[in-house]
Amino acid sequence: MVGTAQGRLCPPYGRSVRELNMDVSTIEDRKTRARAWFEALRDDICASFERLEDDAPQGLYPGEAGRFTRTPWQRTDHSGAAGGGGVMSMMSGRLFEKVGVHCSTVHGEFAPEFRAQIPGAADDPRFWASGISLIAHLRNPHVPAVHMNTRFVVTTKAWFGGGADLTPVLDRRRTQDDADSIAFHAAMKEACVQPNGVADYDKYKKWCDEYFYLPHRKEARGIGGIFYDWHDSGDWDADLAFTQDVGRAFLKIYPDIVRRNFASAWTAADREEQLIRRGRYVEFNLLYDRGTIFGLKTGGNVDSILSSLPPEVKWP
């Protein structure tokens, strides 16, 4: 969840992150509010996805509707000290082949090799971070895979990060003029242009396009969305409101996209194309995704980190 702030895939689109200059009670209140939002959003998303499981056509999706299973976990930091933890929410259903909606709140000290890479950690390695992370892979190749995460990070500085992106798995649907692409981009733009006025949609859309790119394939992972990090406008309440708007936009648009596609029948060729496209997803997450790499190198929960990988995949 806490990624490095450097690297080829992370152009410096974030605003300058300010040094914290406030009393402890204010910082703690902000931590509490951010964590509460992430966990409430998790609950709303899980409930929405379970309704989709109930409503999916029985003829295409036989069997019982899936339900989320929650598994708590704890972590230790590099010194062995207690470092918080989280809750994995996983579902393998008749519509959602695999979906994880995870919340975590972690704290501790960054290992020496990471301190220079994190804003505010070079001289004081202590950190706190809370967030929500989601990836969904559906059985129906007509329904795109999706990823969303938002987080709040505190060192001697504090900032928000996150985003959402859509990955159609059929080439004929992987276009910017596809109805799903248009609707998803419109929803993310709406989240960025709310009255709080602290987000830059054009930058965050471009950042997403550049981040979710496989250079060895010379292709994008999906059709894009938004991606942002080190977001600190100087108005914390507005920054939280923006992050909430991203979550609400996702909660509205993705179930709509699922519903408009889940009654479409698919062929064996569609499934084959889906499995091959999932291979690209695996390649990106294991080779380039800084959250995955960082989590594996800093003692994160392996099951949670790798839950983003699809349950079945092929390479031709």
UniProtKB/Swiss-Prot annotation:
Instruction: Identify the residues that bind a divalent metal cation.
Output: H137, H147, H185, H216
Return the HAMAP family for the record: Coprogen_oxidas
Kindly report, in one word, the top-level EC class recorded for this enzyme.
Answer: oxidoreductase
* Any one GO CC term of the record: cytoplasm
Superkingdom in the source lineage? Bacteria
Q: Where is the active site?
A: H147
Name the chemical reaction catalysed here: coproporphyrinogen III + O2 + 2 H(+) = protoporphyrinogen IX + 2 CO2 + 2 H2O
Identify the metabolic or biological route this protein is part of: Porphyrin-containing compound metabolism; protoporphyrin-IX biosynthesis; protoporphyrinogen-IX from coproporphyrinogen-III (O2 route): step 1/1
- Tell me which residues bind substrate: S133, N149, T150, R151, G299, G300, N301
Looking up Pfam families in the UniProt record yields: Coprogen_oxidas (PF01218)
Q: Please tell me where this protein is predominantly located.
A: cytoplasm
For biological process, the GO terms are: protoporphyrinogen IX biosynthetic process
Q: Which NCBIfam families match?
A: PRK05330.1 (NF003727)
Q: How does it assemble?
A: Homodimer.
Task: Fetch the PANTHER family from UniProt.
Answer: COPROPORPHYRINOGEN III OXIDASE, MITOCHONDRIAL, OXYGEN-DEPENDENT COPROPORPHYRINOGEN-III OXIDASE, MITOCHONDRIAL
> Which family does the record assign?
Belongs to the aerobic coproporphyrinogen-III oxidase family.
What does the UniProt entry say about where the protein is found? Cytoplasm
Q: Which PROSITE patterns match?
A: COPROGEN_OXIDASE (PS01021)
> Which keywords does this chain's UniProt record carry?
Cytoplasm, Heme biosynthesis, Metal-binding, Oxidoreductase, Porphyrin biosynthesis
Q: What does this protein do?
A: Involved in the heme biosynthesis. Catalyzes the aerobic oxidative decarboxylation of propionate groups of rings A and B of coproporphyrinogen-III to yield the vinyl groups in protoporphyrinogen-IX.
Which residue stretches belong to region Important for dimerization? 281-316
For this entry, the protein name equals Oxygen-dependent coproporphyrinogen-III oxidase
